[in-house]
């Protein structure tokens, strides 16, 4: 069996975690499977993938020349392509039993509108080549810019299954394909447990980090972003300044009472956010930044590390997913529906701060509430572990149903 996963985002521990868990669970069900990950752009390939995984750089019709080449490929059902990169992609499509849309952010929808067409265009090729495809628990929407909705609708309706990782995305998708079955599960990263023995050994070898954790009775993990990369929030410079001011004061207040602050970069390679976190690191006694570019300390290691912390303050979606998975109380700062939707589904909205409502007092009060409710919060997360894992695995179960159906047809 051969599975192609398209639209994979690299240089991001969150996307890496969701993809790696997907790969691991599919491989458990089908030990003989070959999985090809098509990485968008020229980003770093995911570290520590199993030997049955191959990674390629995905063709994207961005330039005029690439768009012309892609149009020819679609019109000829993939038989003619004047782009070498697209020929590689077409070859992988042809050899695959099914194509999966990688578990990631809302790349289909208004949020990343300027890039969306390069995602949708690949599905035109899949439809022309009569290849089955499935949306493997990404986020999607909103779809208020209606000029593209007929295209979106066509691509969604041609799929074998639409599985989404949050209820808000589900609502958006149902609004434009009301007659199509849409399933809502949980983020793919939940479905595969962390190898604790292997990652404990990695932590033992990471001497500086281990000493820092031992020196502080309680450590708070942090993922932070100034959102200067975001297509909407980057237009308002006040947001970045607000983030800087709020977090500098917050870190100062908690380190004064004995907490250690552990920054956990979510981006690496071309998209490294290590330097941004350095700007918040006031000293080396009470602040520590986990290395970003050492492949040993991958997404699974980050999950294990978060499991050793007292709490997490997360502006990055997957750091909060890691926290929930590992039973570590956390406060999420939500800038897209993916985080808000998860917190609503898990009845954790009291620990979610909308970016528009973020202030010094709100963050301070929410953290104090977490401390007050700590034991109850931690127990709640630990009790929900099996539920979250099972919910996430439903995406793989749906894939299994499709594969069985395809085998029956053959």
Residue ranges and their predicted role:
Residues 1-410:
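Active-site anion-handling motifs in enzyme catalytic cores
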